[in-house]
Amino acid sequence: MAKYIFVTGGVVSGLGKGITASSIGVLLKASGLNVFMQKFDPYLNVDPGTMSPYQHGEVFVTTDGAETDLDLGHYERFIDENLTKESNITSGRIYKNVIEKERRGEYDGGTVQVVPHVTNEIKKKVYHAASTSKADIIITEIGGTVGDIESLPFIEAIRQVRMEQGRENVIYMHVSLVPYIAASKESKTKPTQHSVRELLSLGIQPDIVVARTEQALDDNVLEKIALFCNIEKSNVLVATDVASILWSHKMYEQNAQIVISKLLNLKSLKTDMSEWKRFVEKINQSQQVIEIKLVGKYIELPDAYLSVSESLRIAGYENKVKIKIDWIKAEDVNKKNDQQLLKNAKGILVPGGFDERGFEGRGFEGKILACQFARENNIPFFGICFGMQAAVIEFARNVCHIQDANSSELTETKNAIIDIIRGKDKTDALGGTLRLGNYKTTFVPNTLAHKLYGKKWGFRTSRHRYEVNNDYREQLAQAGLVFSGLYVEKNLVEVIEIPKYPFYLAAQYHPEFTSRPNKPNPLFNGFVQAVIKNK
């Protein structure tokens, strides 16, 4: 029988509920338990696939093709498990299911209400995750902040879960802000007290409070939180401002796994954190700083490229260097200033992104110039998704001399080097129209991609609708572009490279989704190694 941990947040958003949940997942997995993680998001979008990166940050794609919240990237990196579409449930999806059932007459003409129909649908998703994953522990993060009107059905649903499953099978963990007031040199517990009081008014008594704070908290503060939150002092955990990847180690040092095992009546846990300790050692050994220029469209919100930046840092630690990212807005790069913006670059990365007709000036030409600068100056280059398409178009224009080479996604052109995938008809719809999830990529022998992966093929995660136009492949290949990774079944290009350069490679899929702290993605690892050699 599965046991459940629900993680809520209070006072303000952005406190690190996802990192907290992930860290707990690490501890429990290191204790020999099977863990499954999911997140409930209160917004009414069916999924985040059509949301602006400025609103939502990165869209993380699971192997089964679900477009999900960026927190799932944290979950997968921390617990080293591939999650599924059942790991991210939105209010939009819940209400859509309820309305569809009502239209089919499944409620026998009854009045459809938030309680019990919406809450039952939410609980169904929790229990379905338990039955399909066969996990020992289901960790569920509730998005938003306690008290938000949008999250009330989820709070009510998880209250009912404890009633149905029993106190020894359910834990409520609450992450709350404990601000430090510099003027008085005090840590204030009042916001947390009020947040827990709000939670109590909704029928939930938290079992563990995670105090999110800038400064370490002394015993007096911990005792005060415990007193006013009705919990033992040992059940107050502290999360200070450290690198997110270190949170699990900090939780381990506070015996979070012991607290959880007592609350859930688990057998005595033997937690082996040796793998994470090795990773922490790598971080501590990484002193040299290497700068990589990332030329992207949404750099004002770095969370839009969260998995990319995390993958770079992980690869850096693997090679005992710290990666510093120089964020360059693609829209700012033009022929007058590209030399200035990109000079002294040791490595250039152009990540994914989307654009639309009439807005091709919003960054795409800047990405093309970045690709050209890297190629002409023999700078290690790595392109991802839209970044690969930019690299192919740049090569077509400046090496093959196809001056009007472009993407049909952006503009009408006689030479659509990038065109819509056959079978993906053009449509005004946005949601659910992409090539999503894992597809088998075959690597061409004696290429850089084949060397880096060390295998003939593998499944890679895609999120796109446009591809290299096969009508131009022969011309591009004759000019020196190598198509080193292919989806053979439909003859689609997945990886390109230029062999005469130390590292000039781009992938149509998203390698950043598969990096793990002790297992950097091979393409990121190879790119960072090339940058180190170029320093």
UniProtKB/Swiss-Prot annotation:
Organism of origin: Spiroplasma citri
Binding site for L-glutamine: Y54, G353, F386, G387, M388, Q389, E409, R465
Top-tier EC class: ligase
Transmembrane segments: none
The UniProt record lists the keyword Cell wall biogenesis/degradation: no
Note: CTPSs have evolved a hybrid strategy for distinguishing between UTP and CTP. The overlapping regions of the product feedback inhibitory and substrate sites recognize a common feature in both compounds, the triphosphate moiety. To differentiate isosteric substrate and product pyrimidine rings, an additional pocket far from the expected kinase/ligase catalytic site, specifically recognizes the cytosine and ribose portions of the product inhibitor.
Biological role: Catalyzes the ATP-dependent amination of UTP to CTP with either L-glutamine or ammonia as the source of nitrogen. Regulates intracellular CTP levels through interactions with the four ribonucleotide triphosphates.
PANTHER family assigned: CTP SYNTHASE, CTP SYNTHASE-RELATED
Subunit relationships: Homotetramer.
HAMAP family for this protein: PyrG (MF_01227)
Annotated CTP binding sites: S13, D148, I149, E150, K188, T189, K190, P191, T192, Q193, K224
Active-site residues (renumbered): C385, H510, E512
Residues that coordinate or bind Mg(2+): D71, E141
Pathway membership, UniProt: Pyrimidine metabolism; CTP biosynthesis via de novo pathway; CTP from UDP: step 2/2
Binding of ATP, residues: G14, L15, G16, K17, G18, I19, D71
One Gene Ontology term of the molecular function aspect: glutaminase activity
GO CC annotation terms, alphabetical: cytosol
Name of this protein: CTP synthase
UniProt record similarity statement: Belongs to the CTP synthase family.
Region (Amidoligase domain): 1-266
Regulation: Allosterically activated by GTP, when glutamine is the substrate; GTP has no effect on the reaction when ammonia is the substrate. The allosteric effector GTP functions by stabilizing the protein conformation that binds the tetrahedral intermediate(s) formed during glutamine hydrolysis. Inhibited by the product CTP, via allosteric rather than competitive inhibition.
One GO term of the biological process aspect: pyrimidine nucleobase biosynthetic process
Taxonomy, superkingdom: Bacteria
EC number: 6.3.4.2
